[in-house]
Amino acid sequence: MTTVDLGLTEARDRMEPIALPELEARAPLLERRDTKYLVPAAAAAVLLDGGRADYQVLQIDGARVFGYESTYFDSADLALYRAHAQGRRLRWKARTRRYGAGPLCFREIKLKQARGATIKLRERCPSYEHGWAGPELADFVDRSLREHYGQGLGLRLTARLTVRYARTTLVSVDGVERVTLDQELDVLDPAGRATGRLRPGLALVEVKTPRGGPGRLGALLAGQGLRPVSLSKYGVGVALTHPEVGASGLRRVLQSGFCGLDERAA
């Protein structure tokens, strides 16, 4: 563990804990706006210390960092990615997400609304369905699209990529904000081969609020000269896994925050 990593761990350990049931009751935020930042780990440690009075950290069985694995689904021609890249007002992403090595797993869909807010819907599924584009996933996505967009699925989904990372979750004491801090983020293709990762020493911080904006934590980030970035894990994953698609809108973020497989080996 580096000195920087140790500083971040110590800052996380100094925060007051919150249990999962209390966090979900206080700030479910399934309809929200997200603001994202790429933050050096040293700055993240300062951030956690600066937010100790206003935020608590999720703790489960004594742990404060948790492994996540999300598999994203799209059509063969990446229609969902293209809708995102073209900035369509109504666009969505489908995935399954597994928490750690245990059985907890969900089907999830994130739907962008016309006014910019994002709605996240999810339902529990068996862990063996993680990464599988079966009929249960198609039915869940179809129902969600009909409820919120008035139209069904209309395309065949297949697994396109997987993203793994270690996450720390904070919640504000007033329940207005939820903040996630992701590190050790790796992108894998459908065969499980690594295609890229978040640069070592960086964290992807997301501030989630009902109305958008940086929140109190964003103000602390601005005080360190850090500004929001426009990215999605799926968009970055496609750019790293399918470079033939092109990702001109993500070029700056990719260069500053991520490295491909060739660069990792160098």
Where on the chain are the PLM-derived regions?
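Phosphate-end processing signature that detects enzymes handling 5′-triphosphorylated RNA
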Residues: M1-A266
